[in-house]
């Protein structure tokens, strides 16, 4: 798996790597992810801050990143937690646990999330 942490401004190819990771984390109020930064965007007549252009709220809403935390330490902790769910090697299986979730449980939201008529929204 690929894990990426946005610990500051991430632009261009680095932004693509962050967005294509299996799990990605940004630091709120510190990180920004964009193809081109504010100076480049200003050349086409739009003056935007780093946060307006690619702050954590925009990236979470668009699905470009998976998580946002308050500090760099929390970002590393989140990455460690994600990796803790995986085996140490491709030659090992993940630990199995007995789920306490009712296997017959239904979720109305999931049932309604995909319309029965795929031509309607």
Enumerate the language-model features and the residues they cover:
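Terminal amphipathic helices with adjacent charged low-complexity linkers/tails
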Residues: 71-121
